[in-house]
């Protein structure tokens, strides 16, 4: 079994972990709904992209829910 010969210093350990940091998410405010959304993605609220309706929401009836 492999065992380290010397203790890894805090500096070396932290430098190794520097690539694990999470980047900040770029969100924009949707001009039509005012909700936050990711750029170049379909709006989850109303299904629009580039001011065009691309996704229609399915209306659930009481029979489907039960």
Swiss-Prot record:
- Which species does the entry assign this protein to? Rickettsia felis (strain ATCC VR-1525 / URRWXCal2) (Rickettsia azadi)
Q: May I have one GO cellular component term?
A: large ribosomal subunit
Keyword field = Ribonucleoprotein, Ribosomal protein
Can you tell me which family this protein belongs to? Belongs to the bacterial ribosomal protein bL32 family.
Which InterPro entries does its entry note? Ribosomal_bL32, Ribosomal_bL32_bact, Ribosomal_zn-bd
One GO MF term: structural constituent of ribosome
Instruction: Return the protein name.
Output: Large ribosomal subunit protein bL32
- Pfam families per the record? Ribosomal_L32p
GO annotation (BP), single: translation
């Amino acid at each position: 079994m492999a065992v380290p010969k010397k203790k890894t210093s805090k500096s070396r350990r932290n430098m190794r972990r520097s690539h694990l940091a999470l980047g900040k998410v770029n969100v924009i405010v949707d001009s039509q709904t005012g909700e936050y959304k990711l750029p170049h993605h379909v709006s989850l609220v109303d299904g629009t992209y580039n001011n065009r309706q691309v996704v229609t929401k399915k209306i659930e009836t009481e029979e489907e829910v039960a």
